[in-house]
Amino acid sequence: MSRIAILPSAVADQIAAGEVVERPASVVKELVENALDAGATSVDITIEDGGRTLIRIADNGSGMDGADAVLALSRHATSKITSAEQLVGVRSFGFRGEALPAIASVSELQIETASEDGSGTLVRVQAGTLTETGQVARRQGTTVSVHRLFHNTPARLKFMRSARSEWRAIVDAMQAIGVLRRDVHFTVRHDGRVALDWPAVSTLRARLAALWGAADVERFVDVDDVQGVVHVSGLAERPADVGTATRRVLLIVNGRVVRDHGLIRAAEAAYRSTIPAGMRPSLVLQVHVPGGDVDVNVHPAKAEVRFRDRWPLERAVEEAVRRALGLFDASAGIGWRTWSAAPASREPGHALGGIPLEPSALRAAPAPEGLFATPAAADANLAQHAIATATAPTADDLTSAMQVDAMRAEAAREMETLVVPPLMQLRKTYLMFEHDEGVVLIDQHSAHERVLYEQFLGVLERGEAPSQRLLFPLTLHLGPQEADAFEAHRDAFVRLGFEIDHFGGTSLLVQAVPMPHPRFDAERCLRDTLAALIGDRGASAAAKHERLAATFACKAAIKAGDQMSPGEMQALYRALAATVLPAHDVHGRSTIVRLSWDELDRRFGRK
């Protein structure tokens, strides 16, 4: 006797419901997406008891006639596709014909619908069984009411959370849909009151302002970048604001909200060297790729997708966010064009407080005085070294290369016309200058660290740096772990300008070193860098380069307490202005702080 039997349709429907209908929020998502697929421009949602007793979705979409309303309750009945070929690049939210019958199998469901040409239809279903059909007077559109969700599946019912928890999940689901379809008016009522009301808007910022509040949206910079066939747009949190509010992450791929840790990690990688380790930014990103490059039919709830070629896509996302942060950092956040001009009322040759400066310190383009006195820095514009980005353009990415070249050219032009204001050093730690709108302070170590990081990263990715041979070579005796760290990064150290030979056992003979500034302590910097790189052998080449560049920049930069000459201060100012992300060092700390005259007046009681 056979022990294998085909399950009854009611049982099969409940199994399918377990994949599609996890909780009330899942029902809301599926039914609202059906409304949007029907062309609705207005969707009203009614929730009672967190969706446990009632979920009602009413729309003004195309509606259905009587036959389609009944047929829609059958598994795999859909109007979205008719062949397997249409699965490639499908743009509708739904296409499997599973959600509505799955919901009907675990609830008491009622459908009222009317198409443009037909009369209204009423359909009632009890736990998957059709109990009533008839006619009803109504306008075009569809209203789906779901009562007593999971009433016939006690095992599922007992896993329902409190009404408050289920309501929060519904709000989260609706926020994702609201961001996705900004052209639709959504109204959500909960227990008799209007809880959410989002009129149709034209921009992402406007929708997020309605969802989160205008103040929250101010924390974000715009992302809009095209690389080849990939278009990345949206909003990314400003580095200085990361960690100051609730973290929110929303990823939209080809008009569908999805979960993809790889793309989110790629976007977060753009923040490396701008925020402290362990902190994660808020992101709202929209990614558009050709339909044939993405498979949406890989998850029961269509919450995950599969990409044909993931690596170029992740690179495009990272580069888009990095560019957005760079443009913000170099203009809106710092405002070099605004803050670099010296006050017209101040006599030339005097900085804040009337302290005289050397006449040479006021020239628009002074020769670097020690701080960048390497052959490369003497022979090339500082901007060409400092504008290096964390992702070097490759031969197969012509668009990216052209954009990077344009950024460098723009930076070079700005550096040619940049007027360095009179600078003074405070406590051998900060540089300060005055502007019509306030006072600006620069942390000399953090600023130099940022400059060196971008220079070193560019050197590691594009070629070797010049070095200076030592009259008396250094002998370093390393421990086993330090020696292993050196072997893991040997080629990178050579690119940075070190010439190092083995000297027996774990000893090294250092013949030549880079010289980022006259006070550079090569032996200490090399030892400290190797100590910080212990255990980094297994990382990718790109991660190793970033880690080494950040660590070496931190160790090699001038320190608090180092006296700087006027020429060195000007050189640092110019180099920082030419970096991609001037506002933060490699640890995410601020390099620049500005105090407006209004703030100073308030502190002194003048306002």
UniProtKB/Swiss-Prot annotation:
Gene3D superfamilies: 3.30.230.10, Histidine kinase-like ATPase, C-terminal domain, MutL, C-terminal domain, dimerisation subdomain, MutL, C-terminal domain, regulatory subdomain. Signal peptide: none annotated. SMART domains: DNA_mis_repair, MutL_C. This protein is involved in the repair of mismatches in DNA. It is required for dam-dependent methyl-directed DNA mismatch repair. May act as a 'molecular matchmaker', a protein that promotes the formation of a stable complex between two or more DNA-binding proteins in an ATP-dependent manner without itself being part of a final effector complex. Pfam families: DNA_mis_repair, HATPase_c_3, MutL_C. One of its GO terms (cellular component) is mismatch repair complex. Keywords: DNA damage, DNA repair. This is DNA mismatch repair protein MutL. It comes from Gemmatimonas aurantiaca (strain DSM 14586 / JCM 11422 / NBRC 100505 / T-27). PROSITE patterns: DNA_MISMATCH_REPAIR_1. GO terms for molecular function: ATP binding; ATP hydrolysis activity; ATP-dependent DNA damage sensor activity; mismatched DNA binding. Belongs to the DNA mismatch repair MutL/HexB family. GO terms for biological process: mismatch repair.
